Amino acid sequence: QIEVIISDLRLDNFFNRVVQALGSDDSDRVRLAANYLATDLVSLLETHDEADTWHAEHFATLIGMLFDEKITSRIAKDLLKSVVFEGIDPQKAVIEGGLLQNDSKEALAGIVADIVAQNPTVVSDYRNGKQAALQFLVGQGMKLSKGTAKPTLLAELITAYIKEMKV
C-alpha cells in the first residue's frame, strides 16, 4: 500500500494531510486510511487529478466513522468520491441519508426472518455445512438493509435464527 502512495506525489501529499487530520498517533486509523487510499481512491484518480482540491479532513472523518463502526465498508466506498472530490461532509451525508450502521438486533430481526423465509434452499445448504451459504444470506441481508446492517451481527443473528428453526 505504501509503495502505491509514495510513488505518486499527489497521493503522498494527500496522505500526509489525512494523517495530520487523523492524528498520527492512531496507527490503526492511519493503516485503514492507507488501505482505502491505495485501493479505492486510486481507481478514481483518472478523473480527478487536482490533488490540492481533495478534501483530506472529510476523508479522515469518513475513515474515522468506518473505524468506529458507525458506517459499513460499503457505505464508505459509496461516499468516497463525493467526500474527497466534492467536499461533501460525510457526517451530514450519513445522517441525512439514513446510512448509519444498524446494529440493533430488534431492527435486524425482521430482515433475518425475511431472508431465511425467502431462501429455504440456501438455508438447507448452510445446515449441510456450506459456509458460502451463510455469506449469501448475509449479502441478502445487506441488500435488504441498503448496506446499513452490521455484517458480523447479521451473520450471528442468521446463524442463531437457523439453529432455532424447527426442521
Where are these regions (language model features)?
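Charged, compositionally biased, marginally structured helical/coil segments
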Residues: 1-167
